[in-house]
């Protein structure tokens, strides 16, 4: 064969050609190998460079927030019962996409497929519902007025939800809608297709409303009065909307009648439609503001907060505001999921209570009072249920935002002066929801932690008034106070529901009064009165069952009794949950149980007993019951507030390491930044604040003590920038999914044996170091001298 040498053949021309070709092949192979090596090296360098860049250029915390966390919820099962709030921290107005009709508490639900508008909302909870809502919805075509008519399909893949910005593609109209907020205003931007019938529908909703189109000013003004209670007769939300281009057509819709060319009028439900002839990709912008005071004030809010500013400018400023506030806690050394969950929960702690005041034409702070309907000077806050938030959400504000805490106290002073009572669940005025007089906890905790700038004497008088009876609704003051003050408990058979829960929460509130009375130098008889009432929790403790139990007027316990029965003597829980509501005297509770060892066994039992429940009080399993049942954690019900502090109570026993184990279990198992990321209602920042505190490594079991009980931090490092600029560095360098136990704690390099850290120590800044281990340190924190505060131990 040509080019092939056979044995015995003399070398010839073909052989020489073969050698040349072989050398060429070898050369090409060397080049190929060198190329592969060079390319691989370049790829490695690029990868390492990218990794280094990723470490040195962190993602902004505002972009780590998933505002959709908790939105996969419904009436029978809550994964948060949240909505994607587009707002500034504690802003007067929020904005949210709407997937259901106004008045449905689940206004945005992750599993829904259609959007009906982007509405201004003030809803603190689906159970309280919304007020003062109106919406904007871009459409094309005629007859797209009502929510059902104008609804458009959308996909989460074409949706961007940030704290500072929301964007969605409305597939039925080929429109992109965007919104970005200020405190009392917002900017909208709509990108339209080519159409002669592009329009924006402004819906003031039913309940009494008005729209007025002013074409020559490219403006719509109006008001809405929709609410679910807690407002005076003259309640209005006045709004103004100014577009950046003239209207090509307009019409009004009033109580079902469409009136082309009409500039609008009043009615039960009014809608304005303003239209444009647009080219594909053409953008139309609108500036929106509102006021609870007047149209003139709404105009002031609009010009003060959006005048001369572009959409991008407002969005960038809102993003920067969130980055500043969220960036005050910087976490490192966790998984991507943990970091995103942390910032998503931290965002939720900065929404409520909302600002309910405005700045008048002279720059003075004024507010419309939802208590008496007057416009008055000073601050006011609303949309908060203290039954939930006294536990951790409010203490987090006190720690991180002392000036805000002072303003909230000023707002409580004004609420009392305007209504005669402290609010317990305000939205915007008094609402008949939940129990207790937990405003006492907020006030005592703030004052005892050094928060000033308000009239504490007025608040003291308000707290004392609470102890004597209830106000215009049963949730204000103390329902059953007469029985409580004379018998030392609210009786089971006196026709007052949730009586054990009331007794326990009143006893803690009395402890708050006792602490504050001593600090204020009140007369000794007052101090002794409240000191005695702090022990009323003992009156509803059954020493045979080692659980809290309803007690009758004659002093006998309720019968029959099941610790699995929800409601009845308790509030959204059962005896397994409420037995631990002795925040101020855990040592006293342990004594009743027969000692600290027995209390540890009872704590264990909550996780060991099956998730049985008796729902006969409600007639069906309320969502809190179902959330407990499905978590596979026995009768532990983290999805509701009464039990959230419970796992920290191991720190009051000879087995403090069990707190560390359980805290990490709850953080890992029951929280995630996804739409189903909570294990129950988020509730105005409370369930989120539990996660934030716990991830940092401590928790305020007893607001009013100035102590935080130590747990198990989630991250290797967290840097907390305090209000005065000092930095608190929380370090746990050995932290991991396996190393969940605390072997040793050092505060500023000095070994600390106690199971708590004080508020004063945190405010000093410095370094709090946790040395972590895979196995528990069964010696640390076991001495009674190292335990957190309890009234009975004399600390």
Give the location of each predicted region.
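ATP-dependent phospho-/nucleotidyl transfer catalytic cores
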Residues: 509
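Short aromatic-glycine motifs in intrinsically disordered, low-complexity regions
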Residues: 728-736
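C-terminal motif of bacterial Sec signal peptides marking the signal peptidase cleavage site
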Residues: 48-50
């Amino acid at each position: 064969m040509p080019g092939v040498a056979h044995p015995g053949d003399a070398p010839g021309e073909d052989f020489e050609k073969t050698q040349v070709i072989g050398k060429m092949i070898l050369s090409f192979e060397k080049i190929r190998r060198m190329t592969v090596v060079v390319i691989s090296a370049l790829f490695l360098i690029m990868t390492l460079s990218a990794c280094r860049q990723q470490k040195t250029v962190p993602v902004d915390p505002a972009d780590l927030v998933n505002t959709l966390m908790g939105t996969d919820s419904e009436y029978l099962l809550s994964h948060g019962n949240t909505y994607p709030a587009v707002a500034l921290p504690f802003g007067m107005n929020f904005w949210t996409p709407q997937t259901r009709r106004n008045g449905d508490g689940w206004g945005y639900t992750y599993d829904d497929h259609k959007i009906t508008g982007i509405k201004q909302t003030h809803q603190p909870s689906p159970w309280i519902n919304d007020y003062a809502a109106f919406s904007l919805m871009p459409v094309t075509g005629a007859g797209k007025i009502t929510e059902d008519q104008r609804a458009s399909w959308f996909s989460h893949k074409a949706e961007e939800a940030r704290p500072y910005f929301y964007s969605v593609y409305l597939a039925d109209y080929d429109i992109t809608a965007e919104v970005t907020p200020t405190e009392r205003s917002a900017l909208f931007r709509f990108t339209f297709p080519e159409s002669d019938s592009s329009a924006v529908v402004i819906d003031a909703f039913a309940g009494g409303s008005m729209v007025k189109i002013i074409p020559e000013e490219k403006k719509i003004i109006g008001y809405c009065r929709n609410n679910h209670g807690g407002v005076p007769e003259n309640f209005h939300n006045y709004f103004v909307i100014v577009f950046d281009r003239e209207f090509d057509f307009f019409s009004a819709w009033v109580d079902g009648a469409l009136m082309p060319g009409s500039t609008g009028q009043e009615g039960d439900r009014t809608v304005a439609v303003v239209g444009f002839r647009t080219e594909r990709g053409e953008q139309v912008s609108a500036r929106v503001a509102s006021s609870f005071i007047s149209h003139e004030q709404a105009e002031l809010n609009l010009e003060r907060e959006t005048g001369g500013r572009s959409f991008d400018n407002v969005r960038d400023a809102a993003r920067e505001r969130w980055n500043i506030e969220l960036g005050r806690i910087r976490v490192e050394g966790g998984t991507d999921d943990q970091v995103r969950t942390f910032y998503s929960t931290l965002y939720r702690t900065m929404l409520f209570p909302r600002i309910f005041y405005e700045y008048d034409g002279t720059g003075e702070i004024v507010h419309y009072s939802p208590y008496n309907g007057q416009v008055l000077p000073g601050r006011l806050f609303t949309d908060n249920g203290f039954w939930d938030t006294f536990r951790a959400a409010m203490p987090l504000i006190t720690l991180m935002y002392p000036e805000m805490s002072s303003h909230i106290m000023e707002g409580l002073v004004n609420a009392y002066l305007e209504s005669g009572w402290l609010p317990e669940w305000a939205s915007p005025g008094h609402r008949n929801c939940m129990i207790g007089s937990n405003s006492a906890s907020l006030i005592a905790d703030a004052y005892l932690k050094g928060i000033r700038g308000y009239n504490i004497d007025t608040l003291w008088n308000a707290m004392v008034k609470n102890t004597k009876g209830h106000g215009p609704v049963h949730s204000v003051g103390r329902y059953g106070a007469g029985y409580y003050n004379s018998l030392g408990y609210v009786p089971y058979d006196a026709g007052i529901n949730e009586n054990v829960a009331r007794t326990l929460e009143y006893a803690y509130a009395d402890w708050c009064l006792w602490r504050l009375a001593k600090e204020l130098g009140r007369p000794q008889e007052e101090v002794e009165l409240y000191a005695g009432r702090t022990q009323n929790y003992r009156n509803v403790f059954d020493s045979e069952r080692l659980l809290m139990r309803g007690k009758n007027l004659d002093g006998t316990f309720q019968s029959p009794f099941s610790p699995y029965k929800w409601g009845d003597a308790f509030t959204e829980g059962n005896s397994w949950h409420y037995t631990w509501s002795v925040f101020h005297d855990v040592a006293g509770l342990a004594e009743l149980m027969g000692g600290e060892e027995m209390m540890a066994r009872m704590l264990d039992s909550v996780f060991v007993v099956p998730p049985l429940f008796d729902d006969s009080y409600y007639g069906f399993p309320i969502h809190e019951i179902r959330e407990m049942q499905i978590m596979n954690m026995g009768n532990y019900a983290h999805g509701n507030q009464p039990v959230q502090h419970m796992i920290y109570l191991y720190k009051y026993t000879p087995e403090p390491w069990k707190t560390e184990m359980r805290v990490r279990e709850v953080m890992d198992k029951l929280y995630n930044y996804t739409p189903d990321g909570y294990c129950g209602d988020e509730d105005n920042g409370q369930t989120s604040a539990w996660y934030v505190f716990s991830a940092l490594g401590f928790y305020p079991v007893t607001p009013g003590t100035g102590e935080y009980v130590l747990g198990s931090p989630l991250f290797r490092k967290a840097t907390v920038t305090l209000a005065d600029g000092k930095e608190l560095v929380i370090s746990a360098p050995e932290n991991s999914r396996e190393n969940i136990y605390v072997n040793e704690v050092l505060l500023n390099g000095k070994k600390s044996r106690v199971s708590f850290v004080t508020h004063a120590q945190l405010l000093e800044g410095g370094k709090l170091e946790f040395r972590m281990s895979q196995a528990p340190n069964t010696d640390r924190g076991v001495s009674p001298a190292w335990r957190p505060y309890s009234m009975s131990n004399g600390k």
